[in-house]
Amino acid sequence: MRLKDKVAIVTGAGKGIGRAAALAAAAEGATVVTVARTQSDLDETVRLIRENGGTASSLSRDLTCGEQAASMVDSVLQMYGRIDILINNAGGYPKEIYEGREHQAIRLWEWSEEQWDQIIRTNLRIPFLCMKHVIPVMIRQGSGKIVSVSSRMGRIASQMGAYSVAKGGIVTMTKTAAIQTQEYGIQVNAVAPGMVDTPGQRVYNHSVGQDDAVMGSADDVA
């Protein structure tokens, strides 16, 4: 087991890629702390991990709030005394933003300030806050690994507006963090998957008339 005795935080672990990543980390021997807003989703992830012989706990947090991100880190340290791995997966593209568009993209100038801020807060602010509070712990330890989940949409000029901007920001933030933390024995990387078969992706595909799109699985990413 490659992750035996390691403590891993997985954000957005209630479903989709986050759940698959939590299960994969646990299968490799890590003690997994699952984090998301919805406790019932976390309960199911923890149940699946334990059912397969793994070790897991859960923390319900709104990670767009800096105080709650700090509280997450404090709670993990109180429980386990260290943080070896952070999987920065929390994010999303709320369906209320694209519902009723009749397969039409939101052009850049059509985004409301509220919509734009919501997407940036969910997809870029959360990974920033998690790194902000986890990295000092890893520096003290002299080691750690961080993996953030970006998207193919963050690497191209896409029709997804703020979502693409946020996911592209993750790539740049990852490169910055990697350069600034390498002297402390910390490795920072990102993955940028294409379409992944998750509940949210299926809803989005239907809204834009792509029900027959070929998708990868969350396990592929994990």
Enumerate the predicted regions with their spans.
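Alpha-helical segment proximal to the catalytic Tyr-Lys
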Residues: 136, 179-180
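Catalytic Tyr-X3-Lys loop
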Residues: 92, 104-128, 143, 147, ...
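Active-site loop-to-helix junction immediately N-terminal to the catalytic Tyr of the SDR YXXXK motif
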Residues: 157-164, 176
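Conserved glycine-rich Rossmann-like NAD(P)H-binding loop of the short-chain dehydrogenase/reductase
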Residues: 28-44
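C-terminal helical subdomain
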Residues: 183, 190, 210-222
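Active-site helix of classical SDR
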Residues: 131, 166, 174
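Conserved glycine-rich cofactor-binding loop
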Residues: 7, 14-16
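The beta1-alpha1 cofactor-binding region of Rossmann-like NAD(H)/NADP(H)-dependent oxidoreductases
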Residues: 40, 60-72, 113
